[in-house]
Amino acid sequence: MRQSVAQPFPPMNESEFHRAVDEVLARIERAAEATQGIDSDLEAGILTLECRDGSRIIVNRQTPNREIWVAARSGGFHFAWKDGTWRDTRSGAELFASLSRIAAEQAGESLQFG
């Protein structure tokens, strides 16, 4: 059984969650646009990052769980809001650091978040 490390704190209502995720997706999209080898497409709340080799990293919201989900070649990851940042529900790793690592592994180019 999957044990969650992160719980929303403070709890977000649905509107706050959507606003927070929209900001996250926009930030990821800006980071992808600053690269040479990762294209981004945001449609219907799903952000697709396409690498030069045609592989994809998908970032989307999971509203009922108040999580951000990331699907990549290396696996699936769930992030929940905890202590002021988005944390992997299994490892506790921070979302933007994880995405940078995932992009470096998959696309050969990390995402830089400033």
Positions of the model-derived regions?
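Short, Lys/Arg-enriched N-terminal segments with co-localized hydrophobic residues
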Residues: 1-11
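N-terminal intrinsically disordered, cationic/polar leader segments
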Residues: 9-114
